[in-house]
């Protein structure tokens, strides 16, 4: 089932408990307010707070006693399905008390309870009510069994615990066995005798008459209440010790009846803890250790009885199975088993007081059948059966590490001798045979102790093929079967040994000189002949073991396949060393590096492959000598020497990243090629204005017409002087005869290039011209403030200022040129830049004239935008303050009078502004 299916009831109970706790808390809060109101009323009537409180409580208890039975029926019929453990507010389920005279009721009797006594129910109710007013929502956790005692101011043994409000609300963390049934004093319930573990705490004789009056009823009611599906319980108990004991008595029964109210299994048995832990964590300060242990140990016994089961008799269990690796991993246990026939492992059964001796069925077990598990072929061994029959007791086998260490020592002894090349083949064979014969010396030790022989048999290692290969005597073959069983474990490393043996024999044979491959194969086979497993298997008298042992050594023909190295013709067929002559052929070129490259393939790599072949064994030494005689390093030296002797190329010249400005295109000094459209005959007009062609329209010009008659022939001449847009001057003479305009001829009689591009003044000249004309132009413009100049156009102000202000001594405005342009600015969104990259010749000064072309100024600080020039506009500079210019202009917003304004050229975002410096009249020439 899913987690939700298992715990949905718990979550539902928690939700209900939370809602109920909120309701009870709200009720308790209302009660507290009502109580405060009663206290204030008592103060008005002159009744002290304590007396008013007691009177109100006593009156409330009286009504509570009369109405408890009705509410108890409602309680018994309700089933919320949860046990919240709430201890606040349930006893106040009755209606609000009415205003009554507190003095009309007698005061309750005052009595000081002695040590270990429980106060009467009435006093406990008062203390309980006081505590409930202070603790509206207290859902106790596991330690609520001691924290639920009511406040009793006159009983120091059971003081109130005001620290409980710090615990958070835990509606479903409390187990069902902690539920506190609401107490109804007048409910008719028969007393029930206490069960075992439910005896109350002894009290003095003074309360012997009062204590039993409600304790049986409480016990009976609680048991009945718990069996009624545990309705929601939110009332805090009005009793202290007996309530706890009664909850203990119903704890086991409650666990069996309602496991659904146990969301936390790990915390459902808190009473099974040791009394010491409970004393340290949950003991109230009024209890002493003895009483608390008595009240907690007994519930522990009652709680543990249905949970714990009696331990079964260990003798009823079958003996533990024998693990196949028992002898290897646990030598001490296997030894005890061999001596007594019983494994020492199940000693844990003795913890329960039962005998550790197992059933006698294991004593008659045949050790030969059990065998040692690792190698199945060696389970049955004749020698082991003889040893078991003679001694009838299994000896503890030695540690496998010792055997492996012995075998490794033997391996080191056998492999260390053939490593140096023997003087002769016979000597090497004899040395190996003598070493192999020396191996069995330590082996007879297991014979003296037959038990050790059987023990070694228990963890048989893999076979060791080293002594089998190197031994030629019968003594090694007659070794004990224990070693024969150990050898199969080391079966695999023999391939490496055989390979090492071949290498050693090859090295020994290579020392002799030239040998035939047949001799090598015969010697190799002679050395491999001692590996005869049949001789080793002879000492084993059993029938199954030799058949099982023989197949493994029979796999050894694989080393016999080793004659593959005898296929020496392959290196013979390898004409690759013969190709070495190519290196000699490569000596033909004078360049020595090529032989070096040729010698590299002649390195020992080829000789190593041939090193296994006997006839070519001398070649590596020769190659090595040749390499020593002709070292490759001196060969590349000529290259380095040649490179050193050759003069290095000169360093490249340093790069110069400074780029000179591109030269301006050559200015055509000659007249421009204009289309005069002579075919139209515009020049033949003698009466009225002439209609100039397109290239000449809009230009300033003057013209003259003349004719000459010679008899019947009449020659006509038209002279026209033009000022071009760049202030250049050109003159044309057009002639034709009679009235035939088709034969008209044109001739350029005069051309004066533009002064802007051909007469560039210096800074001193510019400053001098400003001093000469600037003040006149500016002052004349200032005098015209508020007046209309000329036709009221902006251009008229600049023209008249130059013409009239300077007395015809300055160059008068022509087209949109008012002198020499000293600065040209172009605006964009990224800022202001100079047109064509031309830096200004001088700063703007007083008397200079500005010409605007479709300009837009945006003041980012003020947020204003102004358009100047649509498409052109002209103004006169009166003052330059650095960041702005004060100018005089006309025809602003169709207001055709002169005004003074300010402008900032840094705010230019679109258009072009050109500043002109007044120049002399002869600067531009005359038509």
Curated annotation (Swiss-Prot):
Keyword Membrane tagged:
yes
The answer to whether the entry has keyword Membrane is yes
The entry's keywords: Membrane
**Ranges annotated as biased composition (Pro residues):** 558-568
Q: Where is the composition biased (Basic and acidic residues)?
A: 41-60, 479-488, 571-593
Its principal location? membrane
Q: Which residues form a coiled coil?
A: none
Membrane topology term reads:
Peripheral membrane protein
**Chain segments carrying region Disordered:** 22-671
Compartments (UniProt record):
Membrane raft
* Pfam families with a match to the protein in the record: AIM3_BBC1_C
Q: Where is the composition biased (Low complexity)?
A: 22-33, 67-93, 123-193, 206-222, 233-275, 401-417, 424-440, 503-517
Gene Ontology cellular component list? membrane raft
Q: What's the superkingdom here?
A: Eukaryota
Q: Which Gene3D superfamilies match?
A: 3.90.1720.60
Compositional bias per record (Polar residues), positions renumbered to this chain: 223-232, 290-303, 383-395, 469-478, 618-629
Q: Return the similarity comment.
A: Belongs to the AIM3 family.
Protein name, entry field = Altered inheritance of mitochondria protein 3
Upper taxonomic classification of the species?
A: Eukaryota, Fungi, Dikarya, Ascomycota, Saccharomycotina
């Amino acid at each position: 089932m899913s987690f939700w299916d298992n715990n949905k009831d718990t979550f539902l109970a928690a939700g209900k408990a939370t809602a109920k706790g909120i309701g009870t808390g709200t009720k308790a809060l209302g009660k507290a307010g009502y109580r405060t109101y009663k206290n204030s009323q008592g103060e008005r009537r002159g009744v002290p707070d304590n007396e008013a409180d007691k009177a109100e409580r006593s009156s409330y208890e009286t009504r509570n006693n009369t109405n408890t039975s009705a509410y108890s029926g409602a309680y018994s019929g309700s089933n919320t399905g949860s046990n919240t453990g709430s201890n606040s507010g349930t006893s106040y389920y009755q209606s609000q008390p009415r205003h009554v005279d507190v003095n009309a009721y007698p005061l309750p009797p005052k009595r000081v309870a002695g040590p270990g006594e429980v106060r009467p129910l009435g006093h406990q109710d008062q203390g309980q009510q006081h505590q409930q007013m202070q603790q509206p929502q207290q859902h106790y956790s596991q330690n609520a069994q001691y924290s639920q005692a009511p406040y009793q101011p006159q009983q120091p043994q059971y003081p109130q615990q005001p620290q409980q409000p710090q615990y958070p609300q835990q509606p479903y963390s409390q187990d069902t066995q902690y539920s506190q049934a609401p107490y109804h004093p007048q409910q008719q319930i028969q007393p029930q005798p206490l069960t075992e573990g439910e005896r109350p705490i002894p009290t003095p004789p003074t309360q012997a008459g009062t204590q039993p009056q409600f304790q049986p009823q409480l016990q009976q009611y609680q048991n009945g209440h718990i069996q009624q599906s545990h309705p929601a319980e939110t009332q805090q108990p009005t009793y202290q010790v007996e309530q706890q004991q009664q909850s203990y008595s119903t704890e086991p029964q409650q666990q069996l009846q309602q496991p659904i109210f146990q969301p936390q299994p790990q915390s459902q048995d808190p009473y099974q803890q040791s009394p010491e832990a409970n004393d340290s964590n949950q003991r109230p300060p009024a209890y002493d250790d003895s009483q608390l242990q008595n009240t907690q140990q007994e519930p522990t016994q009652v709680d543990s009885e249905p949970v714990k089961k009696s331990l079964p008799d260990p003798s009823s269990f079958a003996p533990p199975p024998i693990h196949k690796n028992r002898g290897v991993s646990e030598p001490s246990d296997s030894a005890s088993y061999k001596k007594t026939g019983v494994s020492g492992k199940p000693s844990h059964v003795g913890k329960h007081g039962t005998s550790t001796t197992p059933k006698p069925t294991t004593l008659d077990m045949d050790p030969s059948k059990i065998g040692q598990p690792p190698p199945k072929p060696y389970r049955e061994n004749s020698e082991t059966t003889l040893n078991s029959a003679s001694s009838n007791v299994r000896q503890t086998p030695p540690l496998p590490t010792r055997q492996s260490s012995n075998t490794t020592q033997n391996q080191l002894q056998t492999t260390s001798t053939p490593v140096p090349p023997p003087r002769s083949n016979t000597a090497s064979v004899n040395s190996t045979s003598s070493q192999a014969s020396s191996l069995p010396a330590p082996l007879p030790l297991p014979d003296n102790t037959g038990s050790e022989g059987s023990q070694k048999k228990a963890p048989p290692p893999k076979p060791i093929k080293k002594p089998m290969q190197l031994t030629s005597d019968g003594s090694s073959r007659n070794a004990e079967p224990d070693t024969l069983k150990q050898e199969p474990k080391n079966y695999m490393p023999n391939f490496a040994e055989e390979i090492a043996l071949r290498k050693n024999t090859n090295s020994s044979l290579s020392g002799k000189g030239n040998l035939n491959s047949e001799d090598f194969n015969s010697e190799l086979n002679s050395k491999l002949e001692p590996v005869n497993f049949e001789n080793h298997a002879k000492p084993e008298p059993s029938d199954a073991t030799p058949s099982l042992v023989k197949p493994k050594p029979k796999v050894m023909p694989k080393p016999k396949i080793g004659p593959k190295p005898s296929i020496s013709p392959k290196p013979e067929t390898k004409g690759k060393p013969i190709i070495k002559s190519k290196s000699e052929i490569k000596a033909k070129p004078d360049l020595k590096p090529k032989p070096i490259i040729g010698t590299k393939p002649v390195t020992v790599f080829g000789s190593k492959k041939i090193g296994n072949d006997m006839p070519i064994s001398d070649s590596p030494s020769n190659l090595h000598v040749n390499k020593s005689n002709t070292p490759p390093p001196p060969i590349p030296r000529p290259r380095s020497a040649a490179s050193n002797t050759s003069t290095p190329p000169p360093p490249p010249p340093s790069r110069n990243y400074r780029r000179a400005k591109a030269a301006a295109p050559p200015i055509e000094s000659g007249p421009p090629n204009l289309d005069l459209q002579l075919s139209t005959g515009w020049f033949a007009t003698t009466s009225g204005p002439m209609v100039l062609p397109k290239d000449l329209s809009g230009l300033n010009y003057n013209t003259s017409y003349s004719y000459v008659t010679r008899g019947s022939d009449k020659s006509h001449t038209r002279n026209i002087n033009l000022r071009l847009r760049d202030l250049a001057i050109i003159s044309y003479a057009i002639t034709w005869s009679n009235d035939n305009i088709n034969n008209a001829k044109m001739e350029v009689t005069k051309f004066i290039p533009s002064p802007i591009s051909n007469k560039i003044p210096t800074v001193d000249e510019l400053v001098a011209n400003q001093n000469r004309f600037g003040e006149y132009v500016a002052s004349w413009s200032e005098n015209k403030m508020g007046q209309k100049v000329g036709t009221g156009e902006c251009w008229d102000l600049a023209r008249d200022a130059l013409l009239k202000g300077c007395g015809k001594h300055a160059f008068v405005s022509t087209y949109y040129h008012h002198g020499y342009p000293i600065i040209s600015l172009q605006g964009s969104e990224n800022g202001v830049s100079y047109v064509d990259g031309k830096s200004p010749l001088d700063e703007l000064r007083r008397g200079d004239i500005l010409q605007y072309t479709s300009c837009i100024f945006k003041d980012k600080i003020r947020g204003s935008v102004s358009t100047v020039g649509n498409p052109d506009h002209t103004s006169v500079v009166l003052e330059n303050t650095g960041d702005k210019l004060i100018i005089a202009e006309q025809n602003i917003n169709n207001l055709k009078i002169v005004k003074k304004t300010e402008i900032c050229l840094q705010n230019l975002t679109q258009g072009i502004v050109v500043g002109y410096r007044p120049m002399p009249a002869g600067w531009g020439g005359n038509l």
